[in-house]
């Protein structure tokens, strides 16, 4: 639904806010306006950070400098003539991630929240070093070029056309970044079990994708991880077989050509495709190399893995001379795979678990063990911990969601299995992994995150308040309270060390670190008051392990017939040996049942296991406040330096009678508090210069945007001949977030505008000029969701209700009222098919009336209203399909 101006009458368009629904992220700030940003720098980097995080900033700056030297040697290149790389430290999201871009300047963002131990990046000892190695590789490769592109960048700045490497397929770019992170970090993804297990299981099942199936974005397991998994394994395979010097040579080939075409036979373009570029380096096409890669994995996975190869003492409850098969020891109860986490038994012979399916919205599911039927209990994303209270028949879980429209923090929720209702217990508390105290129904043990430290905490259900009871550590996850309430087991990570299992007293004192010096250990579960189970990273595998606190004996359930375990739960009862676990297989994580007494295990004595039996003194792993390092004095962030334009690019606008070439530039500071975009054009027929300027300020609660435009079109009328139509507009716009969470979003919109519209006829004397000054108000709601394999929105709704009024007392020539309503709904059929419904209603009244049109109008900048994604649904009908002062539209696609 858009409005349309007519050359035959003094009527101008009314904005119907479609862009707000297409680009809802533009209506709220990314970082809270109250954050005071500081910076430190050296010759190569500028680290920008919130006040109070200087120690992290100093460590980041030093680590980045070390990695830069190492990575430029690895890739055999130097970043010529580039300004300093900006690194922004973000502690506003309880998620582990990073990003990098060269546009409009080289910048990296690091989420300071460390990954949990079950993450594919959770095996590293140093999260900041790992993410910096990955993102710096992107920056170095993005900036690779040739003499021609380096010269052109001096003139046009960071114009994307002058950065050929960004056009390399994403799976190759991400594969190179994972390869580099693994070359510079012990915990890189190629050095830890997760990727190896996924690849081996997929290869063993004969599900490695063919070249044609892999190209692009595959929808089979592991979904969005595929470009990292296969890309990294492929690049690593090439480095091992053909030499690690071939990988940087490949980047140079991609960077040499300024555009992805070469010109042969005159000016006829011939694409230098991916196959040809690989062939120049490896003398084989990508398809041939991929077949070699597949054959390598088929050969490697022919034999079944044997994880127990160290000659330890083995015990099997059945017949050790005739070990059971996998099918005899594990009863799979799901088969579709994907991500299944935190399975727990409930008292009604059912299992509750979290299903994170990249094809649909995640949530908590329930599985009936007898019938094997599943049903979704609730929709919820960002779940990071789950606990079942058998006394209450309730699920307590933690999940990250938006808080105050800006932060994405983890909070505690309660799901009543009797009523299937969810209650949010905290807001913005940064609490994780809730576990009920067996002796106090109002007490919940959990982990609390404060700045860059993790603490054991107690949440009181009566007062809805939490209290820190332990020292701070680099990270803490997955806690469990012993049945006798004398110990709290936790997955613990100290600074630059591996994940371990530690015991705390109920008052938060660290009593013992059980697995110091072992591989990664996490996810403790109590069998009884003295036997503690957990997951152990052992021989490139994840297996069950246990510690008997009475004897200090360390058991490893390294049965070669058991797949790698990701999460598990024990059925309540001293004599009950049932266990449900989430296993790695070729489809992802599937749930299976096991009996502990049937599992083969081996015993290691305390000394052999490296157990730390002595009582540890309480200590803080969180960096203490210290004086800034010499030469690293912090100062306020210089946003003006980054706001200055860093590029110019060609642009155009047109109508049916005139094409106007022009230029565009834009800029933003690192915190996105200030941003602008400037476009200018010149028309040879109208002999006019157009300007379109927008500045946005995100330093207050409402996002404020100032817009000025002076645009001219050369038109023709059958009655009056050629004429020049001019629209001059000043707008002050405000966006007010009402409801922001991961499931849906709602905003208020306000607009004050002063607008002048005129037509100057070339064959007649005089001109028509009209003033339209007033306000616009709107409210918008959007719950439409895209998923990994979506080519359009797949479910949810979006709606908008808007009203506009022009006032004479503001200088308008007429009092005009206009209103519009738009509703869209998306219904998933058999995927990826979607049924979309669209209803639009509009009307205008007063001393004059607005003119609306309904249809997929093409804008004067060459893009359709629905955006440049041709697969977006609800494109509507062709331009000008229906025109009028009011009406409705309904269609189904």
Model-identified regions with their sequence ranges:
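Juxtacatalytic substrate-recognition/specificity segment
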Residues: 28-163, 169
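Beta/coil-rich, acidic/histidine-enriched accessory regions frequently appended to metallopeptidases
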Residues: 28-31, 36-39, 222-225, 250-252, ...
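Acidic/His/Gly-enriched intrinsically disordered linker/tail segments
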Residues: 31-33, 105, 120-131, 139, ...
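A flexible loop/linker signature enriched in serine peptidases of the S9 family
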Residues: 190, 336-339, 354-364, 378-384, ...
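Outer-membrane beta-barrel initiation region
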Residues: 333, 342, 589-590, 595-705, ...
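Feature captures outer-membrane beta-barrel proteins of Gram-negative bacteria and organelles
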Residues: 414, 546, 662-669, 689-708, ...
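Transmembrane beta-strands of outer-membrane beta-barrel pores
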Residues: 652-656, 669, 680-686, 697-701, ...
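C-terminal outer-membrane beta-barrel translocator/porin domains of Gram-negative envelope proteins
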Residues: 709-713, 719-720, 765-893
């Amino acid at each position: 639904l858009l409005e349309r101006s007519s050359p035959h009458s003094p009527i101008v368009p009314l904005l119907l806010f479609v862009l707000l629904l297409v680009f809802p992220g533009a209506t709220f700030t990314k970082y809270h306006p109250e954050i005071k940003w500081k910076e430190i720098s050296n010759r190569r980097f500028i680290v920008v950070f919130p006040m109070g995080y200087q120690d992290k900033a100093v460590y980041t700056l030093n680590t980045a400098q070390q990695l830069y030297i190492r990575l430029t040697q690895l890739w055999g290149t130097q970043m010529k003539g580039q300004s300093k790389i900006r690194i922004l430290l973000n502690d506003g999201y309880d998620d582990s991630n990073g990003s990098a871009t060269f546009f409009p300047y080289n910048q990296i963002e690091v989420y300071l929240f460390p990954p949990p131990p079950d993450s594919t990046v959770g095996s590293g000892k140093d999260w900041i070093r790992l993410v910096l190695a990955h993102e710096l590789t992107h920056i170095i490769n993005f900036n690779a070029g040739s003499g021609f592109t380096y010269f052109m960048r001096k003139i046009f700045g960071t114009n994307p056309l002058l950065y050929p490497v960004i056009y390399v397929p994403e799976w190759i770019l991400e594969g190179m970044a994972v390869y580099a992170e693994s070359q510079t970090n012990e915990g890189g993804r190629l050095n830890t079990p997760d990727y190896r297990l996924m690849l081996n299981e997929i290869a063993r099942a004969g599900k490695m994708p063919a070249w044609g199936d892999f190209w692009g974005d595959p929808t089979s397991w592991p979904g969005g991880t595929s470009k990292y998994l296969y890309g990294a394994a492929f690049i690593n395979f090439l480095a091992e077989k053909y030499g690690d010097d071939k990988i940087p040579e490949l980047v140079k080939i991609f960077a040499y050509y300024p555009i992805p075409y070469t010109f042969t036979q005159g000016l006829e373009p011939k694409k230098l495709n991916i196959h040809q570029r690989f062939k120049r380096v490896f003398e084989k096409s990508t398809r041939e190399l991929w077949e070699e890669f597949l054959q390598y994995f088929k050969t490697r996975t022919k034999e079944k893995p044997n994880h127990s190869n160290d000659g330890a003492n083995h015990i099997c409850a059945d017949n050790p001379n005739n070990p059971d098969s996998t099918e005899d020891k594990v009863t799979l109860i799901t088969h579709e795979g994907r991500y299944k986490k935190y399975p727990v038994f409930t008292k009604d012979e059912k299992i509750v678990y979290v299903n994170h399916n990249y094809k649909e919205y995640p949530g908590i599911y329930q599985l009936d063990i007898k019938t094997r039927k599943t049903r979704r209990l609730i929709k919820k994303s960002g779940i990071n911990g789950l606990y079942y209270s058998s006394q209450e028949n309730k699920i307590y879980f933690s999940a990250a969601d938006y808080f105050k429209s800006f932060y994405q923090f983890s909070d505690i929720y309660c799901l009543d299995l009797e009523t299937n209702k969810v209650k949010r217990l905290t807001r913005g508390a940064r609490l994780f992994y809730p576990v009920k105290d067996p002796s106090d129904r109002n007490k919940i043990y959990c982990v609390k995150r404060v700045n860059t430290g993790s603490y054991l905490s107690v949440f009181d259900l009566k007062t809805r308040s939490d209290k820190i009871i332990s020292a701070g550590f680099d990270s803490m996850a997955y806690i469990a309270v012993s049945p006798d309430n004398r110990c709290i087991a936790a997955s613990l990570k100290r600074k630059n060390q591996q994940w371990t299992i530690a015991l705390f007293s109920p008052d938060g004192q660290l009593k013992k670190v059980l697995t110091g010096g072992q591989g990664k250990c996490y996810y403790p579960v109590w069998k009884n008051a003295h036997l503690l189970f957990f997951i152990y990273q052992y021989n490139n595998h994840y297996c069950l392990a246990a510690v008997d606190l009475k004897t200090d004996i360390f058991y490893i359930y390294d049965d070669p017939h058991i797949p790698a375990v990701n999460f598990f739960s024990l059925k309540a009862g001293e004599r009950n040996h049932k266990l449900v676990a989430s296993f790695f297989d070729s489809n992802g994580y599937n749930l299976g049942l096991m009996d502990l007494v049937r599992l083969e295990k081996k015993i290691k004595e305390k000394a052999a296991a490296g157990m730390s039996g002595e009582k540890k003194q309480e200590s803080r792993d969180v960096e203490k406040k210290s004086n800034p390092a010499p030469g690293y004095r912090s100062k306020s962030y210089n946003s003006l330096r980054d706001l200055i334009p860093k590029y110019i690019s060609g642009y155009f606008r047109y109508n049916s009678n005139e094409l106007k070439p022009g230029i565009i530039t834009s800029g933003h500071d690192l915190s996105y508090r200030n941003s602008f975009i400037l476009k200018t054009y010149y028309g040879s027929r109208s002999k006019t210069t157009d300007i379109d300027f927008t500045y946005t300020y995100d330093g207050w609660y409402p996002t404020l945007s100032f817009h000025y435009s002076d645009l001219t079109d050369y038109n023709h009328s059958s009655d009056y001949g050629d004429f020049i139509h001019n629209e001059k507009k000043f707008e002050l716009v405000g966006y007010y977030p009402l409801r922001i969470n991961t499931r849906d979003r709602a905003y208020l919109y306000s607009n004050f505008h002063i607008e002048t519209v005129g037509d100057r006829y070339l064959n007649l004397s005089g001109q028509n000029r009209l003033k339209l000054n007033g306000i616009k108000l709107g409210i918008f709601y959007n719950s439409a969701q895209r998923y990994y394999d979506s080519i359009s929105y797949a479910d949810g709704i979006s709606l908008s209700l808007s009203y506009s009024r022009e006032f004479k007392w503001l200088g308008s020539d007429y009092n005009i009222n206009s209103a519009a309503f738009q509703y869209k709904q998306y219904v998933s059929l058999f995927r990826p098919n979607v049924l979309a419904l669209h209803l639009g209603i509009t009307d205008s009244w007063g001393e004059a009336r607005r003119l609306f049109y309904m249809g997929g109008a093409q804008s004067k900048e060459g893009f359709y209203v629905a955006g440049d994604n041709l697969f977006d649904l609800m494109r509507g009908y062709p331009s000008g399909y229906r025109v009028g002062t009011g009406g409705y539209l309904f269609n189904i696609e």
